[in-house]
């Protein structure tokens, strides 16, 4: 049974390993999942996600562990985004962990920065008091010694050890900076109940961290739990790095009494907590992966029986005129009414998908959007971007140069608009069905204000140029980029590893949905990986007629095409079998 660790710290707060090193260690230990929960900071999540994504893509999709509802060890270590918020409850310090927050949200990050500013003010006052005790220390010295870190008392102790003011880090706490010591300055903190509400506002799953510390401090843990539960607390760390079996049983009893889901972790800090090991703590802690699955089910409103349907738009759900038939809507309503999830999966950019959704009035409960062939995933209910991979400016510049050398028109995008090198028949053709504004600019890499998920090339008169372009991209970039033919006149370039099939695997794991409960439908080359990854891959008849080779990657072919409700008829038949 794979185990997990949902409480760790990196160099972005007071740990000694970088976010990527944490993920690497978790992978070497065989952990199925790792949560990065730095103090009042999500600055390390992007780096950790990049490392976890690399291992995810290297792992074999056919690993049988992927058939369990627990995070699949066959897909590498899953990175759970998180944060640990320092709070105050009746004059005492209490920590609240938030799992799965909307960490990309600028307002969320700005709020955390304000919390850090209060920490900086406290640290400057502590430096002043330490200088009064003969310790030559300035806040700027700490920042230089620990670049990129959120400075905590642990950093004070390490700095004093390096400079010879103490012989052990614990001596710094005992003599100078521990609670009630002469150089300790309490920090103005958000209240514990407000922190829970704050985390909920940004779609996190709030968990009370290391509750046994508050229990042993002799103030009323039950009163704390009652207040936090009323504010919306959803979990509690039954598992913790220093817990005894008695501690585990005590906190588990409280979890049951207050309707809180178990969570937990080692609170690993690297060398800053000697003897404490990731995944096991100080002893033999082992957190079953099912703990995370239960959290996902509660957080994302899924379950072991939930099914998920990834559906292409153009040529699959949409008719030739880009409309969706009343019967297709009826069947999709039936699908979501049964508690299953629907994913609008397209090669289009996210802004364009949202335009299509509004145009069609297609608002389904629990619907998710997968854009740019799986490079970006968006949760419609929460408004949270769950996943996003982008090209960098150097890649954009090189791709445009290759397109120019072949004589191809190319365009790219930001979150709200397209960028094209010139206007002409290609723009007229492309934007006939895409209702997104565009800017004209020669250098696409310099023009984009936000990094794009893809670059699009168009050839209206000589499709052979697309094949040449595709070959040149492969020679120049190898596995660094993926290239898809999404239309007879289009080729799209996305980051390496990105595909609709990868998005299916990633989203099943994030939502806690069994891979064997997945379905996918499509009609084109860029849908093939999705059809192969799904337990049931549905190829449209029109796709099979245009690209017969796609039939080898599908489990079934619809009897009718996209203009004859081919998809809706097939999905209705599947629902009939599920209901039988």
Where does each model-flagged region fall?
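Active-site phosphate-binding/coordination module
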Residues: 47-50, 80, 84-117, 326-427
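Substrate-recognition/cap helix-loop segment adjacent to the acidic, metal-dependent catalytic center
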Residues: 219-232, 349-368, 464-482
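An N-terminally biased module of ancient metal coordination in phosphate/nucleic-acid-related enzymes
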Residues: 1-92, 177-178, 190-198, 202-257, ...
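Extended substrate/RNA-proximal surfaces in nucleic-acid metabolism proteins
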Residues: 50-222, 286, 291-293, 396-398
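Extreme N-terminal starter segment of soluble prokaryotic enzymes
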Residues: 1-4, 305-310
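Conserved acidic, metal-coordinating active-site core of Asp-based
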Residues: 148-211, 402-521, 525-528, 533
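Catalytic core of soluble alpha/beta enzymes
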Residues: 266-299
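Mg2+-dependent phosphoryl-transfer enzymes with acidic/Ser/Thr/Gly-rich catalytic loops
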Residues: 302-308, 325, 492-580
């Amino acid at each position: 049974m794979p185990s997990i660790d949902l409480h760790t710290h990196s160099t972005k707060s007071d740990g000694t390993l970088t976010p990527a090193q944490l993920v690497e260690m978790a992978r070497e230990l065989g952990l199925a999942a790792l949560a990065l929960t730095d103090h009042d900071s999500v600055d390390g999540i992007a780096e950790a996600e990049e490392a976890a994504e690399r291992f995810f893509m290297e792992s074999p999709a056919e690993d049988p562990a992927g058939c369990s509802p627990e995070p699949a060890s066959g897909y590498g270590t899953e990175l759970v985004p998180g944060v640990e918020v320092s709070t105050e409850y009746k004059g005492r310090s209490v920590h609240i962990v938030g799992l799965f927050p909307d960490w990309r949200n600028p307002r969320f990050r700005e709020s955390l920065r304000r919390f850090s500013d209060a920490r900086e003010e406290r640290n400057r006052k502590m430096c002043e008091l330490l200088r009064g005790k003969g310790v030559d220390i300035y806040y700027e010295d700490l920042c230089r010694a620990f670049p990129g870190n959120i400075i905590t008392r642990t950093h004070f102790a390490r700095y004093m050890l390096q400079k010879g003011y103490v012989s052990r880090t614990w001596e710094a706490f005992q003599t100078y900076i521990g609670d009630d010591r002469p150089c300790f300055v309490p920090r103005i903190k958000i209240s514990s109940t407000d922190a829970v509400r704050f985390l909920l506002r940004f779609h996190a799953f709030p968990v009370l961290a290391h509750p046994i510390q508050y229990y042993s401090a002799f103030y009323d843990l039950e009163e704390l739990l009652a207040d936090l539960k009323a504010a919306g607390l959803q979990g509690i760390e039954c598992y913790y790095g220093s817990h005894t079996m008695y501690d585990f049983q005590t906190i588990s009893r409280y979890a049951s009494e207050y309707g809180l889901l178990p969570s937990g972790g080692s609170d690993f800090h690297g060398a800053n907590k000697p003897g404490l090991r990731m995944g096991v703590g100080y002893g033999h802690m082992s957190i079953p992966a099912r703990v995370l699955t239960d959290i996902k089910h509660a957080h994302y409103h899924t379950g072991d029986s939930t099914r998920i349907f990834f559906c292409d738009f153009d040529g699959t759900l949409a008719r030739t005129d880009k409309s969706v038939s009343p019967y297709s809507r009826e069947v999709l309503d039936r699908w979501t009414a049964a508690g299953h999830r629907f994913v609008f999966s397209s090669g289009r950019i996210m802004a364009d998908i949202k335009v299509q959704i509004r145009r069609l009035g297609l608002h389904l409960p629990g619907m998710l959007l997968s854009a740019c062939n799986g490079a970006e995933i968006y949760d419609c209910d929460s408004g949270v971007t769950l996943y996003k991979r982008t090209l960098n400016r150097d890649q954009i510049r090189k791709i445009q140069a290759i397109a120019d050398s072949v004589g191809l028109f190319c365009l790219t995008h930001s979150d709200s608009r397209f960028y094209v090198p010139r206007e002409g028949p290609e723009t007229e053709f492309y934007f006939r069905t895409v209702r997104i504004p565009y800017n004209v600019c020669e250098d696409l890499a310099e023009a984009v204000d936000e990094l794009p998920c893809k670059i699009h090339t168009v050839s209206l008169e000589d499709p052979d140029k697309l094949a040449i372009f595709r070959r040149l991209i492969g020679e120049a970039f190898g596995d660094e980029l993926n290239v898809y033919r999404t239309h007879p006149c289009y080729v799209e370039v996305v980051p390496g590893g990105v595909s609709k099939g990868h998005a299916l695997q990633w989203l099943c794991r994030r939502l806690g949905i069994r891979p064997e409960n997945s379905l996918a439908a499509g009609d084109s080359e860029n849908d093939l990986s999705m059809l192969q990854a799904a337990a049931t891959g549905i190829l449209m008849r029109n796709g099979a007629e245009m690209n017969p080779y796609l039939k080898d990657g599908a489990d079934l072919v619809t009897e009718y095409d996209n203009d004859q409700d081919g998809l809706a008829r097939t999905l209705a038949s599947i629902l009939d079998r599920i209901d039988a």
